[in-house]
A protein has these predicted regions:
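Catalytic NTP-binding/metal-coordinating core of nucleotidyl cyclase/transferase enzymes
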Residues: 1-74, 81
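Residues immediately flanking
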Residues: 17, 65, 103-104, 110
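Short amphipathic alpha-helical interaction patches enriched in hydrophobic/aromatic residues
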Residues: 21-24, 86, 107
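Cross-kingdom TIR/SEFIR domain
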Residues: 79, 91-94, 110
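Active-site phosphate-binding and catalytic loops of NTP-dependent enzymes
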Residues: 83-91
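A short glycine-enriched loop-to-beta-strand structural element that forms part of the catalytic core
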Residues: 93-107
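Single conserved hydrophobic/aromatic residue that forms the stacking wall/gate
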Residues: 108-116
Length: 116
């Protein structure tokens, strides 16, 4: 058995709603509607800055980017879009997001015998 190790630099952005559970307790339908609106804004930013979602969990989104610059610019643009959305008089539920960005080396292992 020959195990090969491949490495790849990854830049990950994590977006998470502040106080999501409390919003859901107050008004589940309005919160879900608000989250869907915010998710559209995020997807627009991701497309513009070449990010792609690779995992979601509840109110959290994890996206990978080709560079740290792209991830930071996306995070800033998304926060600006959320601010504009929340300032609208039509907005029932005003959601806030925390954004985290990390860059590091991923290790991939593959068993060469399994690939034949």
């Amino acid at each position: 058995m020959n195990t090969e190790v491949d490495r790849k630099i990854a830049v990950i952005l994590v977006a998470d709603v502040v106080g999501y559970s409390k919003h859901m307790e107050r008004d589940e339908n309005a919160t879900l509607k608000a989250y869907a609106e915010c998710e559209k804004l995020l997807k627009t930013c991701l497309k513009k800055y070449k990010g792609s979602i690779f995992n979601t969990a509840g109110d959290s989104v994890l996206a990978e980017f080709p560079s740290a610059v792209n991830a930071v610019e996306c995070g800033v643009a998304f926060q600006n879009d959320i601010k504009k959305r929340n300032e609208s008089d039509k907005t029932e539920v005003k959601l806030e997001f925390r954004i985290g960005i990390n860059m590091g080396c991923l290790l991939y292992t593959s068993d060469a015998a399994d690939e034949s």
